Regions:
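Cysteine-rich micro-motifs
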Residues: 365-377
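Long, charge-rich boundary regions
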Residues: 25-27, 382-422
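OB-fold/S1-family single-stranded nucleic acid-binding modules
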Residues: 321, 327-354
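Short cysteine-rich clusters marking metal-coordination/redox-active sites
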Residues: 229-231, 353-356, 371-374
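OB-fold (S1/OB) nucleic-acid-binding surfaces
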Residues: 262-306
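Long, hydrophobic alpha/beta structural blocks
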Residues: 54, 58, 62, 68-253
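Structural detector for short beta-strands of small beta-barrel domains
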Residues: 249-269, 349
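OB-fold and OB-like beta-barrel modules that bind single-stranded nucleic acids
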Residues: 252-261, 314-330, 338
Length: 422
């Protein structure tokens, strides 16, 4: 069963039991985790219902899960405190679960130490996400929204009937308050999942009312249920600052360096580019910029599904200074976005004779250049301006390839110009 659907059902059960539901929280955890649902989601229901009664209802909700699937290991944690009053260690665990790999033993011990009740099915791995969801409100401060509609149960697993044109029209009307609803280049409605889950569509954005307005304007099959979630989607909270020589697998980073070779398109249409790390110019207090570290290298890749984003990567040249963002796997950073900080604007060229306006010829090893016609000489090559099919600023993958947790450029707050991709 879809995790958001289970949370929505739990919230309804709490209301039926006389409790007030303050909010539903949808927390995306580390996207690099191997043992996860597709989006690695953890859910929290903030309520004033008695903790013992909430625990009983959570147990009933867990019993709805498909535990015959070895990949399904749900868990629940009930914290008898306000969402912002959890121990600092629990809030810290949330951040760790978003940025690195956490184990169920640590989660179990931390929940027990805090005095939180817990439930689990299968091997107990679900307690990791459950505890992370409990700590999220205290740990995070950047929140967005998703309005999710659900299908009638007898339609689960069948093709969805959603009018794509109505999706595009509603998305255009409410952009940029609502984002990642449609991929404009392909026309694909990103808000409509391709999996056999109960979700009909989910509309994301910074304004909950706009999200619901878009959902209400979409035409298609009947909507059985709906709910608005407060989420950390579109926030880049999974990214941590790193350097070329400090990144590790299964975490995501922002890394600044210089391009060391021309981007290469390999089999499958994937585009690879390598950057060198940077280090301050030792002994030179007047140095205005970090210099390339000759030892450190980080391979980056824009996979084929990122489509036109690959053209932005192909436009990079050796010497360009960039900040790259993405998850590291097998020593390679999977590009989610990058910033062109400074661009090479010239290239070495054989000098042209100022008198004859002809290209000079080499005068011999280490002897510079000489004009064949008038013998005018030059000491070495000159800098020739080059045209760049790239501007300074941030570039991103298209909506169809964007991870739930990655920030779309249209949200703003970046340290440079942005070139949003719709």
């Amino acid at each position: 069963m879809c995790t958001t659907y289970a949370a929505r059902e739990l919230a309804e059960a709490i209301r039926s039991a006389g409790g007030h539901v303050e909010r539903l929280l949808l927390v995306r955890l580390n996207p690099a985790v191997e043992h996860k649902t597709r989006g690695n989601a953890a859910l929290a229901v903030h309520t004033d219902l008695d903790a013992d009664r909430a625990l009983s209802l959570a147990r009933e909700t867990l019993d709805l899960a498909r535990t015959d699937d070895p990949k399904t290991n749900p868990g629940a944690v009930v914290a008898d405190c306000g969402p912002g009053d959890v121990p600092d260690e629990v809030a810290g665990f949330t951040v760790d679960a978003i940025r690195s790999i956490q184990d169920r033993t640590t989660a179990t011990l931390l929940a027990d130490t805090a005095g939180f009740a817990r439930l689990q099915r299968g091997n107990g791995r679900g307690v990791v996400g459950a505890l992370a969801a409990v700590g999220a409100w205290a740990a995070l401060d950047d929140w967005t929204y998703e309005h999710i509609t659900y299908r009638e149960p007898d339609r689960w697993g069948t093709d969805r009937d959603v009018d794509a044109e109505s999706v595009r029209a509603a998305a255009d009307e409410h952009y940029p308050a609502v984002w990642d609803t449609v991929d404009r280049a392909s026309g694909y409605p990103v808000c409509v999942p391709r999996t056999p889950c109960p979700i009909l569509y989910g509309v994301r954005g910074d304004d909950p009312d706009a999200c619901q307005a878009v959902a209400d304007a979409i035409e298609g099959e009947p909507v059985a249920r709906r709910a608005t979630f407060v989420t950390n989607q579109g926030t880049d909270v999974h990214l941590q600052d790193g350097s070329v020589d400090s990144v590790t697998d299964a975490s995501a980073y922002r890394v600044t360096g210089r391009v060391v070779d021309a981007p290469e398109t390999r089999e499958g249409g994937h585009v690879f580019v390598t950057i060198a790390g940077e280090e301050a110019s030792a002994g030179d207090p007047a140095a205005s910029a970090p210099q390339p570290d000759s030892e450190s290298r980080l391979q980056c890749v824009a996979f084929e599904p990122t489509k036109r984003f690959r053209d932005r990567v192909r436009a990079l040249r050796p010497g360009d200074r960039v900040t790259v963002c993405g998850e590291v796997s097998d020593g390679t950073l999977k590009l989610e976005k990058f910033a062109a900080r400074s661009l090479v604007r010239t290239e070495p060229a054989t000098p042209v004779c100022p008198t004859c306006e002809r290209t000079m010829s080499s005068a011999g090893r280490n002897q510079g250049y000489r004009c064949r016609d008038c013998s005018t000489s030059a000491d070495g090559k000159t800098d020739r301006p080059i045209e760049r099919d790239l501007d300074r600023g941030w570039y991103e993958v298209p909506p169809v390839a964007r991870r739930h947790i990655a920030t779309p450029l249209v949200r703003g707050g970046f340290d440079g110009a942005t070139h949003p991709m719709r």
